[in-house]
Amino acid sequence: MSETYLSSFHSAAQHGPRPLPLFLSLLRSETATSPERRAAALAGLKAYQEAERPAGRVARPAIATAGRASLRDYGGSGVPVVFVPSLINPPFILDLAPGNSLLEWLATQGVRPLLVDWGTPGPEDRDQGIDHHIAALLLPLLDALDEPPILAGYCLGGTLAMAAASLRPVRGLVTIAAPWRFRRYGDFARAAIAAQWEAARPACDQLGLVPMEVLQSGFWQLDPARTIAKFERFAKLAPGSDPARAFLALEDWANAGAPLTYSAGAEMFERFFRGDRPGGGRWWVKGTRILPSRLACPALELLSTTDRIVPAATAAGLAERRSLALGHVGMIVGGRAREMVWQPLRDWLLAAAHTK
């Protein structure tokens, strides 16, 4: 039986947003002074929940496994480029839909894209922290390859890829919208994130997992106005139109996703957001201090000046960087992503592949 990325969520009677009670609370507060906006947002929500979905994207074959993680092959030829997605959302943002898949496109451009699929943890995995994900899942997948790859990490996956590039010989490293200097989220945002974690931590401890609803709540709080406004806009789209299908694909991705292990979630909130260990030069993995300045390979960071999820100020500050104004997700699947991200990324990957 072939795997699909969206099987359980896709078959739900309603499609979110998750957590729905919080979404409705935000909707009420954001539209408190405008009955017209509230009606439009509710109409958009209803249309989203009732819209027909295409069949879920089929997962590509795995060429290597390590525990619950796997390395999925997108074909192509040339140097292997291992894409490391975030632990927080599903990996298929990099393979969102036919015609809007960075990985499928790169496979036609002279590189061999491979995607890390972190799998679905269970309560028995509660003690697997972020360092475990690197040492016991990511590094063995890299070791299974016949040659050193280029690493490309998106969002928190870029943070993890930085560590992997410090622990294994690689041809190059690209980080895309990846946080590193967490203190630069600012005191207000970090305090709100800390309060959210303190409220959720006891239940997560009991579960042994951090459900995606906990993480989604944090994302929404970063930009509640946009969270509601996009459903107002969706209400105006013709059902089945290209913009409507694109919205459904992206929102279904944002509302899907496996939980984090308890330890990975706790470390993200406590060691990264609160303690800023990466940005403070105090993050050690397998006895190695992870410092961007010590990378022994070509490295590029792509960041967005309009990113609310990972503000540009939180980037590592690599010597080679490109600043764009496409938004956190728009860098990967937006209307200008191919021209402004995909094509320059391809050019950089091909150049790095020939660097001795």
Where are these regions (language model features)?
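Alpha/beta-hydrolase-fold enzymes
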Residues: 1-27, 146, 160-260
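N-terminal targeting or regulatory segments adjacent to alpha/beta-hydrolase or S9 domains
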Residues: 1-54, 356
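Short, surface-exposed "cap/lid" segments of acyl-processing enzymes
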Residues: 51-122
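Alpha/beta-hydrolase active-site loop
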Residues: 127-144
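Gly/Ala-rich beta-loop-alpha elbow adjacent to hydrolase catalytic centers
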Residues: 152-161
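Short beta-strand/loop motif that positions the catalytic acidic residue
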Residues: 295, 301-303, 307
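Conserved loop-alpha-helix segment in the C-terminal half of the alpha/beta-hydrolase fold
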Residues: 305-322
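Catalytic histidine-centered segment of alpha/beta-hydrolase-like enzymes
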Residues: 309-312, 326-340
